[in-house]
Curated annotation (Swiss-Prot):
Belongs to the influenza viruses NEP family. The keyword Transport applies. Average number present in a viral particle is estimated to be 130-200 molecules. GO terms for cellular component: host cell nucleus; virion component. It is found in: Virion; Host nucleus. Interacts with protein M1. May interact with host nucleoporin RAB/HRB and exportin XPO1/CRM1. InterPro entries: Flu_NS2. GO terms for biological process: exit of virus from host cell nucleus through nuclear pore. This is Nuclear export protein. The gene is NS.
Length: 121
């Protein structure tokens, strides 16, 4: 697990929690929750890859792990679209920087999850 990615997640979550986007605060809270869920999922996949031979354990724990993987990729795509939309509508430079970093992080995490999942297959 890349320590820079972990600190990036923490930084972005902290920045997002400080934002006041008016009526869209529920949307932002939803994004924060999904970011946290995505981080936990990515971390658990990374740990499974680190423990060689853990594929069988992962499959035994959850026979639908491939389905979960597909759902996570859908969540990532949704988050990417939401972040892009927020980037288009916000005029505050602090928020723009935060959403740009969030977009970069999402793309990075998507690639990491793909790499982890290919190693598990």
């Amino acid at each position: 697990m890349d320590p820079n990615t972990v600190s990036s997640f923490q930084d972005i979550l902290m920045r997002m929690s400080k934002m006041q986007l008016g009526s869209s605060s529920e949307d932002l809270n939803g994004m924060i929750t999904q970011f946290e869920s995505l981080k936990l999922y990515r971390d658990s996949l990374g740990e499974a890859v680190m423990r060689m031979g853990d594929l069988h354990s992962l499959q035994n724990r959850n026979g639908k792990w491939r389905e979960q993987l597909g759902q996570k990729f859908e969540e990532i795509r949704w988050l990417i679209e939401e972040v892009r939309h927020k980037l288009k509508v916000t005029e505050n430079s602090f928020e723009q920087i935060t959403f740009m970093q969030a977009l970069h992080l999402l793309l990075e995490v998507e690639q990491e999850i793909r790499t982890f999942s290919f190693q598990l297959i």
